[in-house]
Amino acid sequence: MSHRDTLFSAPIARLGDWTFDERVAEVFPDMIQRSVPGYSNIISMIGMLAERFVQPGTQVYDLGCSLGAATLSVRRNIHHDNCKIIAIDNSPAMIERCRRHIDAYKAPTPVDVIEGDIRDIAIENASMVVLNFTLQFLEPSERQALLDKIYQGLNPGGALVLSEKFSFEDAKVGELLFNMHHDFKRANGYSELEISQKRSMLENVMLTDSVETHKARLHNAGFEHSELWFQCFNFGSLVALKAEDAA
């Protein structure tokens, strides 16, 4: 059962940096629905993309799986034999709950839920990889190497789904979408104090990129095609495709 997010409703003397700890994991479903515009649509559409791209006898990776929402969406839409989903997160609290969520929904496709660092996981025989609001928490200097590894581990014709919060090269547009996002959170019941305190904790650990920067990295990794398929305010998702005739 999900609890309502009230983590920042009272003043916190020393905020520190954001961590995905037990307190966050407990309220995460409510938090992300009220904080990330379009999140439910992205999760649903990841399942539709899985139906199109997952191939028999291959693996799907959910890198930074949190509580397993994307993993479950993928699994509901796999209709092939001998597939496996590998879900990884470095937060013990998230992984504990993820295992419970996965076990609560029975399906033929097995899921390996792993507590670990996505930078250390080998990507092999993959028809689809999901990075759902995960890359933004890596150091910018480490992002290209992860995308390179994903490209190498994808089979020809495979897909990467990359969802992120974006920054914008046009400052005026960035300001507008930033303010619209805050309006969204206010409309979902967050107070000015809650919005401010959460932003202060996130600003040193969640470093956003522009869509142009993401596309450049994907191109450098080897992806022949990439495009933004969903956006709501300053949140969105790209799909990157490995050519069917890639070596």
Swiss-Prot record:
Say which domain of life the source belongs to: Bacteria
Q: Which GO terms describe its molecular function?
A: carboxyl- or carbamoyltransferase activity; protein homodimerization activity; S-adenosyl-L-methionine binding
The record's keywords, sorted A to Z, are: S-adenosyl-L-methionine, Transferase
Q: What is its EC number?
A: 2.1.3.-
| Catalyzed reaction equations | prephenate + S-adenosyl-L-methionine = carboxy-S-adenosyl-L-methionine + 3-phenylpyruvate + H2O
The record ties this protein, via CDD domains, to:
AdoMet_MTases
The keyword Transferase is assigned to this record: yes
Any one GO BP annotation for this protein:
tRNA wobble uridine modification
Other facts: Mechanistic analyses show the involvement of a unique ylide intermediate as the carboxyl acceptor in the conversion of SAM to Cx-SAM.
The record's comment on protein family reads: Belongs to the class I-like SAM-binding methyltransferase superfamily. Cx-SAM synthase family.
The protein's name in its UniProt record: Carboxy-S-adenosyl-L-methionine synthase
Q: Which organism is it from?
A: Escherichia coli (strain K12)
